Design a protein with these regions (language model features):
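Short beta->alpha connector loops
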Residues: 32, 154-158, 212
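Primarily the HKD phosphodiesterase
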Residues: 139-196
């Protein structure tokens, strides 16, 4: 079978999604091989409707039949994986719609945008008119739990840096790795207290981005990740945060951190 072009794949994906039955059949058969009775019981639809959908999928080489049992072909399996990911991405964005819609996402690489479904169990916290510091307070309380932290620091914020230094000083925070911009790094370097207690701290590793731009604030420990973003007008927003404590969410966050780490140079202590 010849390889399909991206345009052909898009058209076929759209064709699948325009039918609830076709979509349900692909997802159902992703679990295991099934016969008509299995599919009737699961989908609660008449045999004629199910058979029509199966025939359409067979014609597209997504489903095959053997001894009255239906299963996905290799192409069907790939389609199912992409379909499930697409649905989970949509769900992940929908449940935290206010967070994603109101911010600049250009700092998130395409690969992680495509895997945003891994944040589907994130907790969204937003400050309110009666509690303007709710998001920031939640963040400060969160990092107090951490023995190790990875932080992508896009802004020079004394509130955040002072809290980090406090945790380093009382030794509750044992390891800290920071990725930041050249501008933020120089601001830290020109601050005597921060230079002494942060830049020259043996428990701290700092990486400076070669491109002087960072559009997200990400913090990761072994137990949680926390994401804040910028508004579309370029201003940093500390009033909305996304906290994730799942293995999937941590994987997503660490992949994002590693992406930016590859674009950085390590600061060598004097």
């Amino acid at each position: 079978m010849k390889n399909k072009t991206g345009n052909e794949e898009f058209k076929e994906m759209r064709y699948i999604l325009t039918s609830t039955m076709r979509t349900k059949l692909i997802i159902s058969l992703y679990d295991k091989t099934k016969n008509i009775q299995d599919l009737r019981n699961e989908l609660d639809k008449p045999s004629a409707t199910i058979l029509h959908g199966l025939k359409e999928l067979e014609n597209l080489s997504y489903v095959k039949k053997l001894n009255k049992y239906y299963s996905l072909t290799s192409n069907g399996h790939i389609l199912a994986v992409n379909l499930i990911k697409l649905i989970e991405n949509w769900y992940s964005i929908k449940i935290n719609k206010q967070f994603w819609d109101s911010h600049d996402l250009s700092g998130i690489p395409k690969r992680e945008i495509q895997n945003i479904y891994k944040l589907k169990n994130s907790e969204y916290i937003s400050s309110t008119t009666t509690d303007l510091s709710k998001a920031l307070t939640s963040y400060m309380e969160l990092i107090e739990e951490a023995e190790n932290l990875k932080i992508m620091l896009p802004v020079f914020s004394e509130i955040h840096i002072d809290k980090i230094m406090e945790l380093l000083k009382n030794r509750s925070l044992k390891e800290l790795e920071i990725i930041t911009t050249e501008d933020v790094f120089h601001s830290i370097e020109n601050h005597p207290k921060y230079k002494t207690n942060l830049l020259n701290n043996e428990s701290v590793r700092i990486h400076v981005l070669r491109k002087n731009e960072l559009k997200l604030f990400l913090s990761i420990s072994s137990k949680f990740s926390c994401l804040t973003l910028f508004f579309n007008d370029g201003h940093y927003d500390d009033s909305q945060i996304l906290i994730d404590r799942t293995e999937e969410g941590l994987e997503w966050s660490n992949n994002l951190f590693d992406h930016y780490k590859e674009l950085s140079d390590k600061y060598e202590k004097c």
